[in-house]
Swiss-Prot record:
One of its GO terms (cellular component) is plasmodesma. GO terms for biological process: translation. Belongs to the universal ribosomal protein uS8 family. This is Small ribosomal subunit protein uS8z/uS8w. It holds the Pfam family Ribosomal_S8. GO terms for molecular function: structural constituent of ribosome. It comes from Arabidopsis thaliana. Keywords: Cytoplasm, Ribonucleoprotein, Ribosomal protein. It is found in: Cytoplasm. Disulfide bonds: none annotated. HAMAP family: Ribosomal_uS8_A. Its main location: cytoplasm. InterPro entries: Ribosomal_uS8, Ribosomal_uS8_CS, Ribosomal_uS8_sf.
Length: 130
């Protein structure tokens, strides 16, 4: 199987496991971008704890699911988004303004759209979850 996007594979396996009612899922291979994305999801309570397992290859991540994740996905290609354009992207990708987050990679690190708006930085859209 050809891997186009490691982040896409990780989010899709989490989404599928969540829909099947699983309590945990193993993601491999791992990357720094996946770990940062998971930290943002964990900060907002959409997943539980996760653990990085070093197998001296590409690594694995075991994620505890808590049943809050409805949908998550990757936006490819990674479109440039200015601070003023974030609102349009939230309207396009998320079901409502009250919940859900868009994850951006910015010059100040990987963060959700609300934190990017507070820090007044734009960046590239990585993905979303709600």
């Amino acid at each position: 199987m050809v891997r186009i996007s490691v982040l896409n594979d990780a989010l899709k396996s989490m989404y599928n496991a969540e829909k099947r009612g699983k309590r945990q899922v193993m993601i491999r291979p791992s990357s720094k971008v996946i770990i940062k994305f998971l930290i943002v999801m964990q900060k907002h309570g959409y997943i539980g704890e996760f653990e990085y397992v070093d197998d001296h290859r590409s690594g694995k991540i075991v994620v505890e699911l808590n049943g809050r994740l409805n949908k998550c996905g990757v936006i490819s290609p990674r479109f440039d988004v200015g601070v003023k354009e974030i609102e349009g992207w939230t309207a396009r990708l998320l079901p409502s303004r009250q919940f859900g987050y868009i994850v951006l990679t910015t010059s100040a690190g990987i963060m959700d759209h609300e934190e990017a708006r507070r820090k007044n930085v734009g960046g590239k859209v990585l993905g979303f979850f709600y």
